[in-house]
Regions:
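Short intrinsically disordered terminal tails
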Residues: 1, 111-117
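Long, low-hydrophobicity ectodomains and other hydrophilic envelope-associated domains
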Residues: 2-9, 13
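Short, compact, well-ordered microdomains
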Residues: 67-108
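Amphipathic alpha-helical packing elements
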Residues: 9, 20-81
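Short, ordered beta-strand-loop transition motifs
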Residues: 15-19
């Protein structure tokens, strides 16, 4: 079934501030912070810098987007620096397509470790 954007696979992640509250949704529903994978920030999500709240957001987005906890854990710190740390303060959106493009760039630039066992 297509989502509200007309694409079955396309998700839309959105972050905004309402007063002091930070709201992050995926296709209009609250994003699960995934504290079960790693609890960086018990106070929740943040963005626009490279701290613990942005790490929690990066992990939550990738876990939801990828549907693979191991892949999310492998990439979320790099995703945090590449995307989350650069998001504007008041409001932002990221689509599945944009996330896929970023993940591909991160894979392409990851150094190959030869002889590591």
């Amino acid at each position: 079934m297509p989502n509200k954007h007309g694409n079955e696979d396309e998700k839309r992640y959105e972050g905004r501030r309402e007063g002091y509250a930070v709201i992050v949704t995926v296709d209009g529903r609250r994003l699960n912070p995934r504290f079960d994978l790693w609890n960086h920030s018990p106070t929740g999500f943040e963005w626009g810098y490279g701290g613990s709240g942005p790490a929690q957001l990066a992990l939550a987005i990738l876990a939801d987007h990828c549907g693979n906890d191991e892949q999310a854990l492998n990439f979320y710190q790099r995703f945090k620096w590449a995307v989350i740390a650069e998001l504007p303060r008041r409001h932002w959106t990221q689509t599945s397509q944009e996330i896929d493009q970023t993940l591909q760039k991160l894979r392409d630039t990851e150094p190959i470790l030869e002889g590591v066992t």
